[in-house]
A protein has these predicted regions:
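Acidic, proline/glycine-rich low-complexity intrinsically disordered segments
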Residues: 1-108, 112-123, 128-129, 135-137, ...
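Alpha-helical protein-protein interaction modules
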Residues: 93-97, 101-111, 115-238
């Protein structure tokens, strides 16, 4: 149910997991999936509360899940995502690696761990895992297309400074989010082919209000201040 990307589906999933926990407080996966669903709902504006409140609630759920079953790869996969959201990058990598060591063929694990690796400097390894996730599961559960997988690949190519490859992958995305929109036009600027009259460029300016850019940048979860500054400088020129 939490894979139905609607407010109703999210609420139903939370109620389902609460009932599962009520029936069996030691159900590790119920705690883990509740954390995932809370994060999804908050990120999309369906669950209220501050960012700090959400980190606390989801973190408590995941910590409880790991306490109950430290050998559950789902728990480590989700805990990696929680730490990434909190910009705790080394902890994100640690739990991502644990999930990967347990189930190295799960595309969700490959994708999540790959995202962390490229951010933390293991760019080639992370990019390889992101490519494998796309190959194994091009349309993730709950999605209608491969935009998520392609957008993840853009992150890897961005860190690798494979700007030509980045632009080619971006052509396969049906609807760009802020991350893909920013990366592709940043790449074009680096190659001196940026056209500010381009339709997709103008659509991004209309869709993503400038006042929200600092928040959007923060949600890219980029550890390196130098890279954050480069992206901020690029945005300031447009």
């Amino acid at each position: 149910m939490h894979h139905r990307f609607t407010p109703e589906g999210n609420q139903q999933a939370l109620e389902f997991f609460d009932k599962a926990i009520e029936a069996d407080a030691n159900n590790a996966q119920a705690h883990a999936w509740k954390a995932c669903t809370l994060g999804q709902g908050w990120f999309r504006g369906w669950v209220g509360g501050t960012q700090e409140d959400m980190f606390q609630m989801s973190g408590d759920c995941i910590a409880r899940a790991v306490d109950l079953n430290e050998n559950d790869f789902e728990c480590h996969r989700m805990l990696s995502a929680v730490h990434l959201s909190k910009h705790e990058f080394q902890l994100a990598e640690e739990h991502g690696r644990k999930a990967y060591d347990m189930v190295p063929s799960d595309p969700r694990v490959l994708s999540g761990y790959g995202e962390v690796l490229v951010r933390n400097g293991s760019v080639d390894e992370g990019l390889d895992l992101l490519g494998k996730a796309l190959e194994l599961d091009p349309v993730p559960q709950g999605q209608l297309n491969s935009d998520k997988r392609f957008t993840d690949l853009l992150l890897g190519h961005f860190y690798a400074e494979n700007f030509e490859d980045l632009i080619e992958v971006a052509k396969k995305i049906e609807h760009q989010n802020f991350q893909s929109w920013l990366f592709v036009h940043y790449a074009k600027q680096q190659l001196n082919v940026l056209n500010k009259d381009d339709k997709s460029f103008e659509q991004g300016l209309q869709e993503y209000a400038k006042d929200d850019w600092p928040l959007f940048l923060d949600r890219l979860h980029i550890p390196q201040e130098e890279i954050r500054n480069k992206l901020s400088e690029f945005l300031s020129t447009i």
